[in-house]
Design a protein with these regions (language model features):
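Short aromatic-glycine-(Arg/Gly/Cys) micro-motifs in beta-strand/loop hairpins
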Residues: 1-21
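Intrinsically disordered, low-complexity boundary segments flanking structured domains
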Residues: 11-12, 37-39, 56
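Short, mixed-charge low-complexity intrinsically disordered segments
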Residues: 41-80
Length: 80
């Protein structure tokens, strides 16, 4: 079993009155994901952002649940 942990930052924006997740950005570490998520929210003006990790086993196609590292601003219910 080969498990790979991915660290991701993802922006969230208001679209037609509801919050929607944007394009996820892969990051090299948990700290980088948190820093990128904070920048997406604070500097680039997204409604919110989230940093999370996910462990995946590509050999069997198993995607484990996301582990939220940090949230900024408004995010989708999936990341609360």
């Amino acid at each position: 079993m080969t498990e790979i942990t991915s660290f991701v930052a993802m922006p969230c924006d208001f679209i037609d009155g509801s919050i929607a997740a944007g394009e996820p950005i892969d990051c090299p570490s948990p700290a980088a994901a948190i820093q990128r998520a904070q920048g997406l929210w604070k500097i680039f003006g997204h409604a919110g952002s989230v940093a999370f990790s996910r462990t995946t086993d590509f050999e069997i196609g198993k995607f484990n649940d996301k582990h939220v590292l940090c949230r900024f601003g408004h995010v989708t219910d999936e990341y609360r």
